[in-house]
């Protein structure tokens, strides 16, 4: 018999190999939709670990080592004995003998056949899916769990593996209970038919099942070789026992035994017609009647053993070939056997015998030993297979280190890797399941197996629709429709049979997913969700190219350009709070003239930056580039960052590190440049590449940003940022929206220049301040506050009312603080504007600050010509058509930035841009105003702008005609007549007095004139002007915008 089985297995393998190489075409697809097929990946050579192991990515080393370290010297099994026989024997369940007659009597032949077709439809679709997954690469121990977890990730794969482990244990308990039932019916003291010597009773039966379970565990400890030898003999017994049922219906003479309630008619059409329909009886608990759902829950486990061969993957010679061949062949074989049994039993036994006689199979057989041997063989094999397969599965899960504390179960024997510890644990859990009866166990098994089958089909479906190039299984008989139908069918049947238990099963699976997600160390297995996300992301990114962004859905998309992330962590976190769930990119330039030599450094920096982002929980992308200098590198980042319609609209530049020079800008002044940068040398981290940058480069970068399409923000002082606290004194997010008017008029017609009101920047200050305030930490610990300036006291109330009206229009809730220059005791304002005495130290400080200001030097000359140098001076107001700088000063020394012009009521003048004879003439850095707008509603700005701004909007107001022969000595000097540096000094003093509790200050970035970067002196003076304004202030965010971001439209 053994030689016959060996020859049979050889013939089976030969035929299976021949069939597998045939070029067949799937009947459900057209020629162009055939799945791609590639040769199976070869097993790794012995030298792979020594030669290639050290070249693997760091994340995959531990996983690869754990998988490769297991011994491979044990005897491996072929397709027939390793997959076909286990699957066939596991499918031909003990339920065939113990519960099939009862199911046929309750549901009838037709509905029993329907159960058969539904069960095998689930089984066939699952077999196709698991075959496709297993033939896409090398399969190791763990079977279906290994294949699924490597396909859809450790979280979902691990939860499925644990649920399937529980299902196998419950199936083992059911088979052991079924194994003991015929023993009691044959040898029980009360119900024994052959001999009466075994005591009966609940605890006696429990003792018998415990002994059977212990014997199975002992056999499992002997290894898979013993299992293979035993399975061959058991296979012959079970096949003969199953075939004896239809043969008995033909050759056994009809009989009727009233004592046994059996009426055997032989094969008769009349008997089949009577048993065709269902006739449900009262259930065992007496709470209702049996139904299709309840009987299907008992029937399904009889067909659910299709993964038995896959569970033996660690003991197969070629799992990728054996699993699909053995599984599908076994499914076809067992389906035919079940079909014959249902038809023959339904056509030969009356309904009374089917319902009342649980041993009817034994009574109608040619000889009772056929059925008894089949029950004992099926129960023994299924019990052994369940324990051994479940233990191997637990061992595989433990070796993957998905849940802490399971490493103990990963141990195996030194020769053939027998999981002794896992077998012991499986024994204990199975022992607990023996307290339940067969019907309850079968219903729970149905839930666990259907859930496992559903997720196997789902994982294969996701792999197919992800269109991943590396998913090209050699098994060709599947497509996305078969996997989708298998998924829907599995989950649908699951909820149809028992909604409550199905929901509980999904809930347990979800809990396991969460647990594994938080406890499992990183795995380099890949995740099908990566392919799905990529596919969907690409589709939606293409759609963003078609849609034009509407101002109503504007949100900040930030590109933060930084040098060293360790020293700029505060500004990184600040921008992370500011992004409002949108795009956030960290950009960095590696300066190098040799691109190829810098690639290793680029890879190292990419790892460091990504690790930095992960460790800090920053939701940002990292974009690094190599360039000959910072200017070209940042140009490349700004022009290429983002993808599709998702591109940065705000470029954030940290303020220049002034450590390139080690001297003060003026002696004896409190304004020091040595420590003004938010990056401190002591905080540097040598693992990040960083470069000091000169003012000309920094200003050139800023000019490039200003002429581009993105808005600009410059940050300074964030190393001193005090993060808001939920408890304690409230801090402020201050808005200081200096409204600047830049003159861009033509030299040809100076009497009527064109003025561009930078209303976009004005509104951007409000928008970003409000967005920051919506972040949870900032909302709890900060309040919004608007700071605005007037020069005279009679303008305070009008300005406050105007600001409240504007905030209401913008739908922003904030405190309003109106500061009056004339009413405050400001040393700088008194000294510069009013020409009053101040402290000698203060006057010396101011003189040092203004010593290079040509306007101030001319002003001092004029003051020296006045009669009373201590009183207020008379000074001509600056007129728009009068080129004050050109008339009074050297044209070769133009200002480095357009002076700020405040809207301070009727006393305010607009200052025309200083004109120069430089190469750029009067060229503006920003695109023309009309080209910046994203819509054509010209009334929005006028409705949102403060009244004082609207009053000055006409050319007559902004550009009064020149009056020849005017007496300028009678004019009062006002804030608007000052040079830009003088205004910075006064603003610094007044803002500094009112920002003691300020966390962040949002204000306007004064733009440099075009080509300022071409002169080192001009660039340095521009940087100095900004430093003078920001000296001692809280962290500042200086903004320059070219597009409107606030709308009142619905």
Curated annotation (Swiss-Prot):
This is Uncharacterized transporter C18H10.16. Residues 915-943 are annotated as: Disordered. It is a multi-pass membrane protein. The modification Phosphothreonine is found at residues 64, 271, 939. Residues 916-928 have a biased composition (Polar residues). Residues 105-112, 170-202, 254-295, 356-368, 439-442, 498-499 are extracellular. InterPro entries: AA-permease/SLC12A_dom, SLC12A_fam. The modification Phosphoserine is found at residues 9, 60, 270, 901, 936. Belongs to the SLC12A transporter family. GO terms for cellular component: vacuolar membrane. It is found in: Membrane. Keywords: Glycoprotein, Membrane, Phosphoprotein, Transmembrane, Transmembrane helix, Transport. Glycans are attached at residue 175. The chain crosses the membrane at residues 84-104, 113-133, 147-169, 203-223, 233-253, 296-316, 335-355, 369-389, 418-438, 443-463, 481-497, 500-520. GO terms for biological process: cell volume homeostasis; chloride ion homeostasis; chloride transmembrane transport; potassium ion homeostasis; vacuolar transmembrane transport. Residues 1-83, 134-146, 224-232, 317-334, 390-417, 464-480, 521-1050 are cytoplasmic. GO terms for molecular function: potassium:chloride symporter activity.
